[in-house]
Every structure is written in structure tokens, then in C-alpha cells.
Regions:
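Gly/Pro-rich turn-and-neighbor structural signature
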Residues: 77, 84-125
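C-terminal, well-structured catalytic/ligand-binding subdomain of enzymes
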Residues: 1-79, 117-126, 130-303
């Protein structure tokens, strides 16, 4: 059973309560993320120390909005950790996207889906994904019930010490994601902060704008849904993006670009065997499921 954490108030107050309730888990994840970064760098021929990670965190932290920094500071204070440790735990995926360009790396990760109302059993939109996370992260996963002083309430799945990963808010907006690795990755706003900002919005346009804001660190694929039935898949690089409205049927995405224009940002030497196989397999399995599509059918298709 996942732990549920209730947060309310200002960004700092919510962060501090987050850190206080999950202090041990935040410490565990922060230490683990440093070790994962070191091991990833070593595997790709790049020497890396914890001190270097901390210095990168200090440099890049200030690129984020004040409310996000305040929440990270609250988490750090609540868990009695330096804010650099909290930030680096949040930033590992984007850090790896910048680092991977120094050497070849297999493209693996999550598989996501969008199902339009005309294809779902109850005529409601469906949105979801797998989560290709290290098994060691399971003890630090939590559900966060967020009631901010300003903005809609939200229900979020994430890891201890981190911002939004997957979630839905009371305005009927929901977000998900899977990773992409463009060649223009650079220090900038990390994807968890973008998702966090998107779920703080109360309308479709502002949520999409939050995900495509200037200054992104790397590329990600974002899923956006609205209770009224509107769905879109947003592919991004650090500096470019493309939006694919999903008005009918189903849409599957893995970890390579489907946009012809954005494929120019992929390294032609990267190993895409996993992501391309998963895309075709998910499409085949979903096509084989009984219609209309149900949540149970989606779980079976992705199992």
C-alpha cells in the first residue's frame, strides 16, 4: 500500500511538511540518486564526484521559479538536508539526458497511452503509462494530496522529496510523461518542475503553456488530459516542441520522437531497439483488446 501524504498551505509550508513526514525516505532517495548518477557516468566514461553534482545543483537551481524553489527549500528544511541534495534527486533524469550525449546509451523508459472518449467504454478519456523506475525506488513512492493556498487541489504520484510526476487536479486536468533524449539537452528547468507547474493551472491552455515554457533542460513527452475529453501528446526537446491532439481512437508513445521535425534532434547512433519494439508491441496488444477500451484492458495490454 502506497503511503498517502496530505499537504496544505504555501509552497514552503507544503514542502516542509513533505520533508518532515518522509524524512527517512528523502534521505534514502537523495543518497541513492547520487550513487545512480555516479554509476551512470562511470558506465559512459565520464568521471563524476558528489561534489561536482552539488555544484551543478547550485548553478541550475536558480533557473527555476521562486515558488518551486520555495517548495524544494521546504522539503530540504523538513528533512534536514541541503537543498542541493533535494534538487539533485529531482533532476537526475534531466542530468542523465545531458550526460548521455558524451557516449552511446540505449534508449529505454516508459510506455504511455491516451484513449479518446469515442474509444473508451464509458465515453471518458483515459490517460496513463508504465513507469520504468529502479525497483529500489518502491519504498519511497507516495501519493500526495495537495491543497495549496493558491491554485487547484491535486492528487499526485511521486517519490519522496520530489515534485509532480503523474497527477490530476480538481480543475479536471491530468498529466503524465515519458522520457525523450534530444541532442539539444542543456542545463535548464527540469521536467518535474514543468509538470508541477502544469498541474497548478486551472485551464487547458495554461497547462500546455507550462509544459512548453522556454528554458527547458531537456526533452520529454507529456500527456495532457481534460475531464471534458480533450487530450494531447506533447513532444519536446530543450528548445522545440510539437503538439499532437488526440481527438479519436488511441495514441501510444514510448521513448523516441514521432514528429518528423523533431526526429532531427535524435542521435542517429543511439540504440532505439527497446523503444521501437515497445511501441509496436503496445499498439498490437491494444489493437487485440476488446473494444471499447477499458482500464482493465489497458493494464493487460501493458502487462
Amino acid at each position: 500500500m502506497l503511503r498517502e501524504v496530505h499537504l496544505a498551505g504555501t509552497p514552503y509550508a507544503m514542502g516542509r511538511e513533505h520533508g518532515r513526514q518522509l524524512e527517512d525516505q528523502v534521505h534514502h532517495l537523495a543518497l541513492e540518486r547520487y550513487e545512480l548518477a555516479r554509476a551512470f557516468a562511470e558506465a559512459h566514461g565520464v568521471p563524476l564526484t558528489r561534489q561536482q553534482c552539488e555544484e551543478m545543483a547550485r548553478q541550475h537551481l536558480q533557473l527555476h521559479s521562486p515558488d518551486v524553489i520555495e517548495e524544494w527549500q521546504g522539503i530540504a528544511d523538513g528533512a534536514e538536508l541541503p537543498i542541493e541534495d533535494v534538487f539533485f534527486a529531482n533532476a537526475l533524469t534531466d542530468f542523465q539526458d545531458v550526460l548521455w550525449q558524451s557516449a552511446s546509451a540505449e534508449v529505454h523508459g516508459c510506455t504511455s497511452f491516451l484513449v479518446a472518449p469515442d474509444t473508451s467504454q464509458d465515453w471518458h478519456p483515459l490517460i496513463g503509462q508504465t513507469w520504468d523506475m529502479h525497483a529500489s525506488a518502491e519504498p519511497v513512492i507516495a501519493i500526495f494530496h495537495r491543497t495549496p493556498d493558491n491554485g487547484p487541489r491535486s492528487l499526485v504520484l511521486s517519490t519522496a522529496g520530489c515534485l509532480t510526476l503523474i497527477g490530476v487536479n480538481e480543475a479536471g486536468l491530468c498529466v503524465g510523461n515519458n522520457n525523450l533524449r534530444p541532442t539539444d539537452a542543456e542545463p535548464g528547468i527540469i521536467y518535474l518542475a514543468l509538470l508541477h507547474k502544469a498541474l497548478a493551472q486551472d485551464n487547458w491552455d495554461d497547462a500546455c503553456d507550462a509544459l512548453t515554457a522556454d528554458g527547458r533542460a531537456s526533452g520529454h513527452n507529456y500527456l495532457v488530459g481534460e475531464a471534458g475529453g480533450r487530450l494531447a501528446d506533447i513532444e519536446t526537446t530543450a528548445g522545440e516542441h510539437e503538439i499532437f491532439p488526440v481527438d479519436s481512437g488511441t495514441y501510444i508513445h514510448t521513448n523516441h520522437y514521432l514528429s518528423d521535425r523533431l526526429q532531427a534532434f535524435e542521435d542517429p547512433h543511439q540504440d532505439q531497439s527497446s523503444t521501437r519494439h515497445r511501441l509496436e508491441r503496445a499498439r498490437q496488444r491494444l489493437a487485440a483488446e476488446e473494444q471499447p477500451v477499458t482500464p482493465d484492458g489497458l493494464r493487460q495490454a501493458l502487462a
